[in-house]
């Protein structure tokens, strides 16, 4: 982390709080507020390479006392090959439409986000976001973002994934979907389709965190 040491950045630790992903676990984070600077993209890119993720206008990494289940990962897009389970997932969901959305956040996506959070993460801060906070989360001020949506055969939105764009790749920030589609592995489908899309674009890496 030599790059980070040279920036005179201020890192802070949170107190422990209930984990949104693993039941009966406590989470703690090391985080940094992103300063207003023309060098933000380089800073955010370096933080991402070191395992940090964005949330609103800060970057964080889990530093939990008794758990290390959240593992930062960097997927080499060029070397990525579909596994048997990946192929099964694509076959199960071959009726779905995956496409890039270039517009602003719409009401349909926000309502889907609320439905997902209320079902999966009802006790988390994200479950209580209003629409302005949601848009601030999706469209931050210090780097570009892309949103990919998934639609069913009736053209109803059933899932979305938010990805930040960095110098050497993309970072999967957050994904959500209709809870009733969980058995079809829509969360996994969003990642697989994102990887295949980035492969077409010759994007080097996809950063994410495995839970």
Outline where the language-model segments fall.
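Terminal substrate-recognition subdomain of acyl/acetyltransferases
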Residues: 1-104, 200, 204-211
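A conserved beta-strand-loop-helix scaffold within acyl/acetyltransferase catalytic domains
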Residues: 53-67, 73-183, 192, 197
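Metal-dependent nuclease catalytic cores in nucleic-acid-processing enzymes
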Residues: 188-204
